[in-house]
Curated annotation (Swiss-Prot):
Cofactor(s) listed in the protein's UniProt record: FAD; (6R)-5,10-methylene-5,6,7,8-tetrahydrofolate
Protein's name according to its UniProt entry: Cryptochrome DASH
Xref: PANTHER family: CRYPTOCHROME (PTHR11455), CRYPTOCHROME DASH (PTHR11455:SF22)
UniProt family annotation: Belongs to the DNA photolyase class-1 family.
The organism of origin for this protein: Gloeobacter violaceus (strain ATCC 29082 / PCC 7421)
Keyword terms of this UniProt record: Chromophore, DNA-binding, FAD, Flavoprotein, Repressor, Transcription, Transcription regulation
Cofactor binding notes: Binds 1 FAD per subunit. Binds 1 5,10-methenyltetrahydrofolate (MTHF) per subunit.
SUPFAM superfamilies: Cryptochrome/photolyase FAD-binding domain, Cryptochrome/photolyase, N-terminal domain
Length: 500
């Protein structure tokens, strides 16, 4: 039997099912050394001063790493845990353990790619080959009907071509057994305090008590698909904001790779065979394709995803108004739908997709505040932060994305009436408005003094007055947007045809 040892570097792929770097090493009859490295750069500060990894996501990560270690131990191996820069930690392990090759799942955005390049450079003098695999999307790049650099800019075009001609491979099975680790200290999983973070307080109002790890992710899928059979109504319920069952909530486990998109797809196919095939089963795959799209767009455009001008290259004079940003961040804008969602995020690390669209629109289209401030706050606080999806969606909502539709303004009042008609969600997170009737709960600023007394809420005391006029602020920011758009087109018209 070969004594070759392969190091499998775990990143955002914290699972044993559908894991090609692991499976490939086993196919070579190699001894496997699995590693997770806590990179201190991921626990530093973002440009606007927020924690890059906040306490909710950090706790979910620690739980996921601990679950992976338990899984590997059950298979006869273990997980090495180290703290430091991977491009320094891995070469040291290569020398210590006589590693013959390094396997990992590749990423697509700049911070992660820099680490990959630095690792390859550090391993080159050691003559240790590095093999990168793709395992984060539903569709493998090799099965796309176009090259990465030719990815359609519009999601609809991407989706139609993928649905028509791209194959989706089945997930790889989890190994039944792993060879034991060589003699090496496995290392301790750090505590939140070791990462400079305080333990978040669990809020009983949370829609779901997220627990990190492949085991919990598989259990959530089992519950949502098979125990409660909720998949059959996914399309009709996915925009709800209150309760554990209104959407799959797989996103946190997908973001850290505790669940594989291909495994979810396989389970959907099984559900369609055993239960029902309808527009809801299709729609879950549709949403996974959105996730694929953002990741492939990030791979195509690189750092442009993070430019202030966005993928569209639109130079808008954004404000850095910290006073108003704090009102938005803490849920004190005077618009109940916005405030309820922002307080939910602060208290739990989660917010519905519908909520994210509304609060992002309000920050950029009503307050005119720099979209990077919102994107970085989401990065810090969201349990399910995914770099490509987060920054891609903020590009879109700010109107600077490749698939943006100009100045798309979310009418917060209409959204509230459509998705929270009786005010149950708002009252859940804004107890000061609990006494208001449905006709008033989304527009408390209209309360007469006698109504404020009757319903037990004092505007400007118990709940703030609106920070802006909803429609006047949107009109003012639309004028700024349109001026930037016209300037952008004048510049493009003045450029030679060969330039883009």
């Amino acid at each position: 039997m070969s004594t070759k040892t392969v190091l499998v570097w775990y990143r955002n792929d914290l699972r044993v099912h559908d894991h090609e770097p692991l499976t490939s090493a086993l196919h070579k009859n190699a001894r496997v050394v699995a590693l997770y490295c806590f990179d201190p750069r991921q626990f530093g500060k973002a440009p606007f001063g927020f924690e890059k990894t906040g306490p909710f996501r950090a706790r979910f990560l620690l739980e996921s790493v601990a679950d992976l270690r338990r899984s590997l131990r059950q298979l006869g191996s273990d997980l090495l845990v180290r703290r430091g820069h991977p491009e320094e930690v891995i070469p040291a392990l290569v020398s210590e353990l006589e590693i013959a090759a390094v396997h990992y799942h590749g990423e697509v955005t700049s911070e992660e790619l820099v680490v990959e390049r630095d690792l390859q450079a550090a391993l080159a003098p050691l003559n240790v080959p590095v093999r990168s695999f793709w395992g984060t999307t539903l569709v493998h790049p090799d099965d796309l009907p176009f090259a990465i650099e030719a990815i359609p800019e519009l999601f609809t075009d991407f989706r139609k071509q993928v649905e028509r001609s791209a194959a989706i491979n089945p997930p790889l099975p989890a190994p039944a057994k792993l060879p034991p680790l060589p003699a090496v200290d496995p290392g301790e999983i750090p505590q939140l305090a070791d990462l400079g973070l305080e333990s978040p307080v669990t809020d009983e109002r949370a829609v779901l008590q997220f627990k990190g790890g492949e085991t919990s992710g598989l259990a959530r899928l089992e519950e949502y698909f098979w125990q409660k059979s909720l998949l059959k109504s996914y399309k009709q319920t996915r925009n709800g904001m209150l309760g554990a069952d209104y959407s799959s909530k797989f996103s946190a486990w997908l973001a850290l790779g505790c669940l594989s998109a291909r495994y979810i797809h396989e389970q959907v196919q099984t559900y369609e065979t055993k239960r029902i095939k309808n527009d809801s089963t299709y729609w879950l795959i549709f949403e996974l394709l959105w996730r694929d799209y953002f990741r492939f767009i990030a791979a195509k455009h690189g750092d442009r995803l993070f430019y202030t001008a966005g993928l569209r290259g639109l130079d808008i004079p954004w404000k850095e108004d910290w006073e108003r940003f704090e009102l938005w961040r803490t849920g004190q804008t005077g618009f109940p739908l916005v405030d309820a969602n922002m307080r939910e995020l602060a208290a739990t690390g989660f917010m519905s997709n519908r909520g994210r669209q509304n609060v992002a629109s309000f920050l950029t289209k009503n307050l005119g505040i720099h979209w990077h401030m919102g994107a970085e706050w989401f990065e810090s606080r969201l349990i399910d932060y995914d770099v490509a999806s987060n920054w891609g969606n903020w590009n879109y909502t700010a109107g600077v994305g490749n698939d943006a539709r100009g100045f798309r303004f979310f009418n917060i009042l209409k959204q509230a009436r459509d998705y929270d008609p009786d005010g149950a969600y708002v009252k859940h997170w804004l107890p000061e408005l609990a006494g208001l009737p449905p006709a008033r709960v989304h527009e408390p600023w209209k309360l007469l003094p006698v109504e404020q007394k009757r319903f037990g809420v004092r505007l400007g005391v118990d709940y703030p007055q609106p920070v802006v006029d909803l429609f006047q602020s949107a009109a003012a920011n639309e004028a700024i947007y349109n001026a930037a758009w016209e300037h952008h087109h004048r510049k493009r018209r003045g450029q030679p045809r060969s330039r883009t």
